[in-house]
């Protein structure tokens, strides 16, 4: 999420792609207003790592497939990517596996952030356990006001160090129509492939990108973008899994 123009420039350069003014993907990891947790409470959560450092989150779809955000996989090769799963800590524990291939949504647009979703195929299958479990994709978008949870790793305040332990925050779903209304500040930037979530003083932020927004025990969103971190009247924006479900199912079988 956007903090300042300097941050916008830095992330734009790192991504190697155009980023619209005021809009920044969540690349560096922050759960604002959240608390520490363990992987057994969020066993679908993974850490997507570039060259040994946490880069983005993701969700276990099945033993070989991870769902994440397309903006997490721009200008990168599989040779520098690994996935750590089954650990509460991004930098230790669990099992680390290489990435064999990935596929971004063909309609992903880094300027508008539409269709910000991707699938990753791992080089070896996961063994399911109490700390590694797949999460089902929702078949319908949750109702406006429904309870939801987002999880991830990262700093909890601007300029802070990255905590090693997984964190989560409870939010409320803001439906697409409501998120685009005058109640909030986005207007026409909210597209059919997006859903929002918001609670005053709580949010996902840079680096939680690609991570899971869960409601009713199902994956309903993928952390995508927003203005600021827990800024008033600016919900976090997520790829809408209900709207993109058909693509995910197809891509998972062909990546």
Curated annotation (Swiss-Prot):
UniProt-annotated site: Required for specificity, residues: 203
Subcellular location: Secreted, Extracellular space
CDD domains reported in the protein's UniProt record: Tryp_SPc
Pfam family, one: Trypsin
Domain Peptidase S1: 31-253
InterPro entries according to UniProt: Peptidase_S1 (IPR050430), Peptidase_S1_PA (IPR009003), Peptidase_S1_PA_chymotrypsin (IPR043504), Peptidase_S1A (IPR001314), Trypsin_dom (IPR001254), TRYPSIN_HIS (IPR018114), TRYPSIN_SER (IPR033116)
Superkingdom: Eukaryota
Record: active site: 71, 116, 209
One cellular component term from this protein's GO annotations in UniProt: extracellular region
Single Gene Ontology MF annotation: serine-type endopeptidase activity
Disulfide bond annotation, renumbered to this chain: 56-72, 179-196, 205-229
EC number(s) given by UniProt: 3.4.21.4
Catalyzed chemical reaction(s): Preferential cleavage: Arg-|-Xaa, Lys-|-Xaa
Keywords, ordered alphabetically: Disulfide bond, Hydrolase, Protease, Secreted, Serine protease, Signal, Zymogen
Coiled-coil zones: none
One GO BP annotation of this record: proteolysis
Annotated signal sequence range: 1-16
Residue ranges the record assigns to the propeptide: 17-30
PANTHER family according to UniProt: AT26814P-RELATED, POLYSERASE-RELATED
Family assignment from sequence similarity: Belongs to the peptidase S1 family.
Name of the protein in question: Trypsin alpha-4
Species of the source: Lucilia cuprina
């Amino acid at each position: 999420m956007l903090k300042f123009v300097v941050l916008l420039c830095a992330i734009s350069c790192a991504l190697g792609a155009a980023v619209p003014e005021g809009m920044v993907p969540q690349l560096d990891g922050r759960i604002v207003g959240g608390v520490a947790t363990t992987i057994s409470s969020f066993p679908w959560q993974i850490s997507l790592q570039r060259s040994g450092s946490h880069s983005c989150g993701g969700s276990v779809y099945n033993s070989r497939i991870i769902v994440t955000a397309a903006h997490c996989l721009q200008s990168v090769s599989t040779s520098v990517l690994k996935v750590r799963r089954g650990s509460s800590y991004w930098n230790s524990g669990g099992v680390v596996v290489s990435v064999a291939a990935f596929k971004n949504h063909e309609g992903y647009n880094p300027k508008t952030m539409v269709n910000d979703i991707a699938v990753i195929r791992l080089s070896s299958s996961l063994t399911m356990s109490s700390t590694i479990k797949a999460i089902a994709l929702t078949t319908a978008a949750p109702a406006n006001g429904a309870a939801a949870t987002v999880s991830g790793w990262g700093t909890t305040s601007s300029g802070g160090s990255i905590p090693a332990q997984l964190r989560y925050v409870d939010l409320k779903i803001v439906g697409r129509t409501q998120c685009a209304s005058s109640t909030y500040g986005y207007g026409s930037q909210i597209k059919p492939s997006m859903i929002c979530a918001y609670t005053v003083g709580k949010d996902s932020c840079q680096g939680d990108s690609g991570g899971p927004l869960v409601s009713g025990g199902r994956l309903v969103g993928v952390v995508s973008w927003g203005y600021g971190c827990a800024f008033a009247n600016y919900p976090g924006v997520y790829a809408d899994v209900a709207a993109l479900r058909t693509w995910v199912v197809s891509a998972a079988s062909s990546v």
